[in-house]
């Protein structure tokens, strides 16, 4: 049987992929041209020619050997070097090594901080000085002084209100609420009249922090900070027993709604235990 004769056009068409001619490459001097064929958005066959400039440079031997590694996967049949169909050449980043002398020169050119410039920050007025040297310390800008002034005003108001009524006041309510029998050995119902409950405390609250919070308001006889049994962290509330009832009232007026450790405190009278 004689083999079937085919025309040269059929043989060329059979070599095409999806009816597109193969990619052609040719070099002229230091320029490399790559001609590719593809379909555009309108479905028409177009020819794309890319031009590459050939540059010769000296590289380390390990880099040259790495470029001749055998390729794998979809690029196993590609020639050495990057292939435009599977590889996108990004911008080269060159590493520059700086000597210690150049580094010292660069640091000398940088603007340095003035010798007399202070880097301290005041927590009262946010000035460039230490808080202990703040000129506004002890004024209305100082939060501690503000709490002390509020406590004094609240105590004075409580005394003036009691004197204006002219009514009989029990001995245990005079002089701040627990002048008689207000100590630790007093009856529970007497002590609870000067006890306040502070809630919405953070987990990191300690007895020292609690004492620091209330010691400016007035003397107290007992502090209780509720803690978790397993972790030892604060449960979020505490009880403070003041020596005088007027100090307890001042604590409610001053600390209720006061911001402490990024939380808003809630202070109220302690309810009597059944």
UniProtKB/Swiss-Prot annotation:
Transmembrane segments: none
Alphabetized Pfam families for the sequence: eIF3g (PF12353), RRM_1 (PF00076)
InterPro entries referenced in this protein's UniProt entry, alphabetically: eIF3_g, eIF3g_N, eIF3G_RRM, Nucleotide-bd_a/b_plait_sf, RBD_domain_sf, RRM_dom
Record domain RRM: where: 194-272
GO CC term (a single one): eukaryotic translation initiation factor 3 complex
Location relative to the cell: Cytoplasm
GO aspect biological process, one term: formation of cytoplasmic translation initiation complex
One MF term in the entry's GO annotations: translation initiation factor activity
Keywords on record: Cytoplasm, Initiation factor, Protein biosynthesis, RNA-binding
Role this protein plays: RNA-binding component of the eukaryotic translation initiation factor 3 (eIF-3) complex, which is involved in protein synthesis of a specialized repertoire of mRNAs and, together with other initiation factors, stimulates binding of mRNA and methionyl-tRNAi to the 40S ribosome. The eIF-3 complex specifically targets and initiates translation of a subset of mRNAs involved in cell proliferation. This subunit can bind 18S rRNA.
Family: Belongs to the eIF-3 subunit G family.
HAMAP family from the UniProt entry: eIF3g
Subunit composition and interactions: Component of the eukaryotic translation initiation factor 3 (eIF-3) complex. The eIF-3 complex interacts with pix.
Record's protein name: Eukaryotic translation initiation factor 3 subunit G-2
Organism this protein belongs to: Drosophila pseudoobscura pseudoobscura (Fruit fly)
């Amino acid at each position: 049987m004689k083999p079937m004769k085919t025309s040269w056009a059929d043989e060329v068409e059979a070599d095409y992929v999806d009816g597109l001619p193969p990619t052609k490459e040719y070099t002229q001097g230091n320029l490399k041209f790559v001609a590719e064929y593809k379909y555009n958005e309108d479905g028409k066959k177009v020819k794309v020619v890319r031009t590459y400039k050939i540059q010769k440079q000296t590289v380390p031997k390990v880099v040259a050997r790495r470029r001749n590694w055998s390729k794998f996967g979809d690029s196993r049949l590609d020639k050495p070097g990057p292939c435009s169909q599977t590889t996108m050449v990004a911008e080269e980043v060159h590493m520059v090594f700086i000597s210690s002398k150049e580094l010292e020169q660069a640091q000398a050119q940088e603007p340095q901080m003035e010798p007399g410039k202070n880097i301290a920050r005041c927590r009262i007025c946010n000035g460039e000085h230490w808080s202990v040297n703040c000129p506004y310390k002890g004024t209305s800008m100082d939060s501690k002084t503000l709490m002390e002034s509020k406590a004094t005003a609240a105590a004075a108001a409580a005394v003036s209100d009691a004197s204006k009524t002219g009514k009989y006041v029990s001995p245990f309510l005079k002089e701040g609420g627990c002048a008689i029998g207000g100590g630790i050995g007093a009856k529970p119902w007497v002590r609870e009249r000067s006890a306040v409950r502070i809630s919405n405390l953070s987990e990191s609250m300690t007895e020292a922090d609690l004492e620091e919070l209330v010691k400016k308001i007035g003397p107290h006889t007992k502090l209780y900070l509720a803690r978790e049994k397993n972790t030892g962290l604060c449960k979020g509330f505490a009880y403070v027993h003041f020596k005088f009832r007027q100090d307890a009232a001042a604590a409610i007026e001053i600390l209720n709604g006061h911001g402490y450790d990024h939380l808003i405190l809630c202070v109220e009278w302690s309810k009597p235990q059944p």
